Amino acid sequence: MDKVIAHIDQNQKRYQDEFFALLRIPSVSADPAHKGDCRKAAEWTKKKLESMGMTARIHETPGHPLVYGEWLKAPGKPTILFYGHYDVQPPDPLELWTSPPFEPTVRDGSVYARGSADDKGQFLANVLGVEAWLQANGSAPANVKFLIE
């Protein structure tokens, strides 16, 4: 575990940059004007999973695409499924925001942006945790699957 924690410490700036890049995508699923942004968020997620050595693909749905990724290189071990969503709610009313909703801002040690907690932050924390484990150890103690919609 020490190697994983050291890896996380060494990569904090990159993790923040990746998080902020995802937060800048205005993937508002309830607004048809943002359909392309939802696709962009799905493609961003697929690319991230692939960069970790996972097999990933986008599945088309009647609504917005979902992303499925897997790392199945731990034969005989359990499989962990992580679920999350890249879409966000509309940021209205805009006048209640202290900073632009799709421009991440750090105040008092917290990140403020639409989706920072629900749910881009949550699912990306899982993704980056798995990435840290894989990069620090070369493998994982379980098979891993992600379903992000």
List PLM regions with ranges.
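Acidic/His- and Gly-rich active-site-bordering loop/insert found
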Residues: 2-116, 123, 133-142
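Histidine/acidic-residue-rich, glycine-tolerant segments that coordinate divalent metal ions
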Residues: 141-149
